[in-house]
């Protein structure tokens, strides 16, 4: 029986693909070496310890239907589109060695005619006339008896969109957590015009087989049926949940301020695990009562635009004469935390 396993996903859903990755990683025999190839439609993928409100322009992502996905490994935020090829290498210990998987990717690039080299802890770079340019970034995860190395290769990604989504709004946000370090990047199509996802996958697969001296048939993961993987439904539900993608953010504070025709408002939020643990409201409004009531209602509320709107609009029952002010406040708050 072969010790290798090759899986290729036809899904572009980041939550689906990360759930597949997690299920395989949890249930694989310690003697197995796995290669999983995949790609995602428009998504910002953040590291396990990152704060999406700090790392991303969450409002623009929502407007453009860009998903947020938190992975189980560390590292920084990256933008995925169909111009990225994603790879995951898994192995039990002591077989797991990220230098082996890195060399497999370098060999694959070399076979395609691209001379690249490892740089720093987790990047692959190519030399250009403008200097070194990153074409691949990776992250890693290890448990007691196994580990994985996953990463992306930039084929023909829309690099302009990185800046759109990976630069957060200039919010007054004091946040803990890992901050991404931006690198200068380039696409492989600059070096190999016309290179495709399928060609890159084939090159990585051949380098994987060559390293281990074995070949196996690829298992195709279809988006049209639930994968036959233990606990997939539960894993997918968690991976796609707001509680995991947003609620796992490290504790942070958020200061919002705005001036309306009826007065200025300053909101101070402390947020832990996606819930507001403390809310303070300051205002020079001539009628501060609804705002004082709002501060009490927001304590314990999910830090989510629709929930903030719901709590604000619930005050219309008690303060019908301030309907205009409350609706303006509700719309502003929702926009500010997206």
Curated annotation (Swiss-Prot):
<comment type="function">
    <text>Catalyzes both the ATP-dependent activation of exogenously supplied lipoate to lipoyl-AMP and the transfer of the activated lipoyl onto the lipoyl domains of lipoate-dependent enzymes. Is also able to catalyze very poorly the transfer of lipoyl and octanoyl moiety from their acyl carrier protein.</text>
</comment>
<comment type="pathway">
    <text>Protein modification; protein lipoylation via exogenous pathway; protein N(6)-(lipoyl)lysine from lipoate: step 1/2.</text>
</comment>
<dbReference type="InterPro" id="IPR023741">
    <property type="entry name" value="Lipoate_ligase_A"/>
</dbReference>
<feature type="domain" description="BPL/LPL catalytic">
    <location>
        <begin position="29"/>
        <end position="216"/>
    </location>
</feature>
<dbReference type="GO" id="GO:0005829">
    <property type="term" value="C:cytosol"/>
</dbReference>
<dbReference type="InterPro" id="IPR004143">
    <property type="entry name" value="BPL_LPL_catalytic"/>
</dbReference>
<dbReference type="GO" id="GO:0005737">
    <property type="term" value="C:cytoplasm"/>
</dbReference>
<comment type="pathway">
    <text>Protein modification; protein lipoylation via exogenous pathway; protein N(6)-(lipoyl)lysine from lipoate: step 2/2.</text>
</comment>
<dbReference type="GO" id="GO:0017118">
    <property type="term" value="F:lipoyltransferase activity"/>
</dbReference>
<keyword id="KW-0963">Cytoplasm</keyword>
<feature type="binding site">
    <location>
        <position position="134"/>
    </location>
    <ligand>
        <name>ATP</name>
    </ligand>
</feature>
<keyword id="KW-0067">ATP-binding</keyword>
<feature type="binding site">
    <location>
        <position position="134"/>
    </location>
    <ligand>
        <name>(R)-lipoate</name>
    </ligand>
</feature>
<keyword id="KW-0547">Nucleotide-binding</keyword>
<comment type="similarity">
    <text>Belongs to the LplA family.</text>
</comment>
<dbReference type="Pfam" id="PF21948">
    <property type="entry name" value="LplA-B_cat"/>
</dbReference>
<dbReference type="Pfam" id="PF10437">
    <property type="entry name" value="Lip_prot_lig_C"/>
</dbReference>
<dbReference type="GO" id="GO:0016979">
    <property type="term" value="F:lipoate-protein ligase activity"/>
</dbReference>
<dbReference type="GO" id="GO:0009249">
    <property type="term" value="P:protein lipoylation"/>
</dbReference>
<feature type="binding site">
    <location>
        <position position="71"/>
    </location>
    <ligand>
        <name>ATP</name>
    </ligand>
</feature>
<feature type="binding site">
    <location>
        <begin position="76"/>
        <end position="79"/>
    </location>
    <ligand>
        <name>ATP</name>
    </ligand>
</feature>
<dbReference type="InterPro" id="IPR004562">
    <property type="entry name" value="LipoylTrfase_LipoateP_Ligase"/>
</dbReference>
<dbReference type="InterPro" id="IPR019491">
    <property type="entry name" value="Lipoate_protein_ligase_C"/>
</dbReference>
<keyword id="KW-0436">Ligase</keyword>
<protein>
    <recommendedName>
        <fullName>Lipoate-protein ligase A</fullName>
        <ecNumber>6.3.1.20</ecNumber>
    </recommendedName>
</protein>
<dbReference type="GO" id="GO:0005524">
    <property type="term" value="F:ATP binding"/>
</dbReference>
<dbReference type="InterPro" id="IPR045864">
    <property type="entry name" value="aa-tRNA-synth_II/BPL/LPL"/>
</dbReference>
<comment type="subunit">
    <text>Monomer.</text>
</comment>
């Amino acid at each position: 029986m072969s010790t290798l396993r090759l899986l290729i996903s036809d899904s572009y859903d980041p939550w689906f693909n990360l759930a597949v990755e997690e299920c395989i990683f949890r249930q694989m025999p310690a003697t197995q070496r796995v290669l999983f190839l995949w790609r995602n439609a428009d998504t910002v993928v953040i590291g396990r310890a990152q704060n999406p409100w700090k790392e991303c322009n969450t409002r623009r992502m929502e407007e453009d239907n860009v998903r947020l996905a938190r992975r189980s490994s560390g590292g920084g935020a990256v933008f995925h589109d169909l111009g990225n090829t994603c790879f995951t290498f898994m192995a039990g210990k002591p077989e797991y060695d990220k230098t082996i998987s890195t060399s497999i990717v370098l060999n694959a690039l070399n076979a395609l005619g691209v001379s690249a080299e490892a740089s720093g802890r987790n990047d692959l770079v190519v030399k250009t006339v403008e200097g070194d340019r990153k074409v691949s970034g990776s992250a890693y995860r290890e448990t007691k008896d196994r580990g994985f190395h996953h990463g992306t290769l930039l084929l023909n990604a829309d690099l302009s969109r990185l800046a759109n989504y990976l630069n957060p709004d200039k919010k007054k946000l004091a946040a803990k957590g890992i901050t991404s370090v931006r690198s200068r990047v380039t696409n492989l199509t600059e070096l190999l015009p016309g290179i495709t996802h399928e060609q890159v996958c084939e090159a990585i697969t051949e380098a994987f087989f060559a390293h281990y001296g074995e070949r196996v048939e690829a298992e195709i993961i279809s988006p049209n049926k639930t994968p036959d993987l233990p606990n997939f439904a539960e894993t997918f539900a968690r991976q796609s949940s707001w509680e995991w993608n947003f609620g796992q953010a490290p504790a942070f504070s958020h200061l919002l301020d705005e001036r309306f025709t009826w007065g200025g408002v300053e909101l101070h939020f402390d947020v832990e695990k996606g819930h507001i643990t403390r809310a303070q409201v300051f205002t020079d409004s001539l009628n501060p009562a609804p705002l004082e009531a709002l501060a009490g209602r927001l304590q314990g509320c999910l830090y989510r635009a629709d929930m903030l709107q719901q709590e604000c609009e619930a005050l219309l029952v008690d303060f019908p004469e301030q309907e205009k002010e409350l609706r303006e406040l509700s719309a502003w708050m929702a926009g500010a935390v997206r």
